[in-house]
Amino acid sequence: MSWQAYVDDHLLCDIDGQCLTAAAIVGHDGSVWAQSDAFPQCKPEEIAAIMKDFDEPGSLAPTGLYLGGTKYMVIQGEPGAVIRGKKGSGGVTIKKTNLALIIGIYNEPMTPGQCNMVVERLGDYLFDQGF
């Protein structure tokens, strides 16, 4: 299965009639493996800051999490494994695997819990596969 198929079929899937706004699979070095059309163009320093927060949990809290220039307030995640952000009625979930970051962006009416489930389910699967 191609990386794009993982984004299209597993991240942009329908959950109770809702769907992520945008999604991507990005390497730890910031290289995009696959992304949806609506996924923002991320800057290398944004991915570097996210990677730093996985190594040093809490480092993003004072400044916020940025994706494509959009700022998200960092909320409770799982240190070293999941970072979650909130902006207005939407937000982002980022799951770290051995080689990649699985990123899902949502807006209402999708809920944070639905976004977490979609992103973390694929992240756990890829982690178990060695990715």
UniProtKB/Swiss-Prot annotation:
This is Profilin. InterPro entries: PFN, PFN_euk, PFN_sf, Profilin_CS. Occurs in many kinds of cells as a complex with monomeric actin in a 1:1 ratio. Binds to actin and affects the structure of the cytoskeleton. At high concentrations, profilin prevents the polymerization of actin, whereas it enhances it at low concentrations. By binding to PIP2, it inhibits the formation of IP3 and DG. Belongs to the profilin family. GO terms for molecular function: actin monomer binding. Pfam families: Profilin. The keyword Cytoplasm applies. It is found in: Cytoplasm, Cytoskeleton. It comes from the Eukaryota. Its main location: cytoplasm. GO terms for cellular component: cell cortex; cytoskeleton. Keywords: Actin-binding, Allergen, Cytoplasm, Cytoskeleton. Coiled coil: none annotated.
